[in-house]
């Protein structure tokens, strides 16, 4: 590319940013008042596991007046393709040599076979991360199915816990 064309491209890119046509990425955190004194804060992401399966990943905190908050991670796989093993805890590989376990909330009964939900209250107290996490998903038919959680998603989750 010659210098004149390079300058034109650079000016166009600057103009696009200046006019606000491209906005910076923002956190996808939602807050909903479910009832008076009851707030739900959540982050929703669609992520792919190492096998190429798409997952709906919902991290949420429910806060009720005069009650301790509950913090959960819900994982939803494609119906008919994925089935969680219940009761089975979720292994969270924070870094080499550090694996935390999140208790299965649906140990008694899951709303659907492709849905898993895990208690993150104890995980929040031990939270350490400056990198991605890998979740070992307790599903049927797979030797080891892993879902990588990018660092920007973990930062959203930390923001939900802090508020």
Task: Label each residue range with its predicted role.
Residues 29-65:
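Transition segment at domain starts
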Residues 83-89, 103, 146-148:
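Short, hydrophobic/aromatic beta-strand segments
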Residues 1-4:
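N-terminal secretory signal peptides that target proteins for export/translocation
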Residues 23-27:
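Sec/Tat signal peptide C-region and signal peptidase I cleavage site
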Residues 51-90:
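Short, surface-exposed binding/anchoring microloops in extracellular/periplasmic proteins
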Residues 147-163:
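Short beta-strand elements
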Residues 81, 96-142:
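Short, solvent-exposed, Trp/other aromatic-anchored flexible loops in extracytoplasmic proteins
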Residues 9-21:
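Bacterial N-terminal signal peptides
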């Amino acid at each position: 590319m010659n210098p004149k064309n390079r300058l034109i491209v650079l000016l166009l890119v600057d103009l696009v940013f200046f006019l606000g046509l491209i906005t910076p990425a923002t956190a996808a955190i939602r807050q909903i008042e479910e009832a008076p004194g009851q707030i739900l804060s959540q982050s929703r992401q669609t992520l792919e596991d190492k096998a190429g399966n798409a997952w709906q990943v919902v991290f949420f905190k429910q806060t009720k007046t005069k009650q301790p908050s509950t913090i959960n991670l819900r994982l939803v796989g494609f119906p008919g393709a994925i089935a969680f093993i219940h009761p089975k805890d979720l292994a969270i590989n924070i870094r080499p040599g550090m694996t935390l376990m999140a208790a299965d909330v649906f140990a008694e009964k899951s709303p659907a076979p492709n849905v898993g939900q895990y208690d993150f209250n104890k995980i929040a107290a031990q939270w350490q991360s400056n990198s991605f996490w890998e979740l070992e998903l307790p599903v049927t038919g797979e030797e080891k199915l892993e879902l990588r959680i990018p660092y920007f998603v973990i930062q959203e989750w930390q923001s939900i816990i802090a508020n």
